[in-house]
Amino acid sequence: MTKKLNLLHLAICILLSIGAGLLIRSIYHGDWFEFAGFVTGVVGVYLVAVEHIINWPVGLLNVAIYGYVFFSSRLFADMSLQFFFFALGVQGWWMWARGGPNRTELKITRIPILWWVGIVVALVLGTAIYYPVIEHFNGAAPFLDSLLTVASIIAQLLLNAKKLENWIIWIVVDIVYIPLYISRNLQSTAFLYSILLLIAISGLVNWMKTYKVLEA
């Protein structure tokens, strides 16, 4: 079952994101690709926060746009991350559409505590593997780029499975990405991640409320 979408709230989100994107573009002279990435990014994450399946096609469009933006800024790990995100976006769309057992709605669940050990190990190993690759291609910030790439992939996998903790990882990732993008003169993207941070916090609160209702 697809969550009912509040069209008024969606329209407000779209209009505000377009207005903010145009304002930032006029101030920092960003290009139209970054503007389009900004708008689709805000709208896409809003749709995730309210658990609506249409977030996936919007997210796939956002991934394609930012693949080009990051390539232009020499953030090669972030560029390559978009390929992972596209594949994971297709998987997530399929998982949410298929649902749980007997094609019921996929429910929000939590990960066991021991999963955090595996997540930390995956972060360390993934960063260690990715770092020399990004450094070889003269990436702008190889360590942070690699660490955030691996963390984002983990968060996306948890999101696909509707694990509540995906929002915790996204919140940390967004906080670190903001100064990184400012340092690369991607002010619109940095502002986008500031908004995504707020939406991620809202998403965590919203999903927590839904989870408590399901567990009651």
Segments from the language model and where they lie:
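Alpha-helical transmembrane segments
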Residues: 8-20, 37, 121-122
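Helix-coil boundary and interhelical linker segments in multi-pass alpha-helical membrane proteins
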Residues: 28, 68-78, 132-139, 182-187
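C-terminal transmembrane-bundle signature of multipass membrane proteins
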Residues: 159, 163-216
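Short, hydrophobic transmembrane alpha-helix segments
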Residues: 20-32, 49-51, 71-72
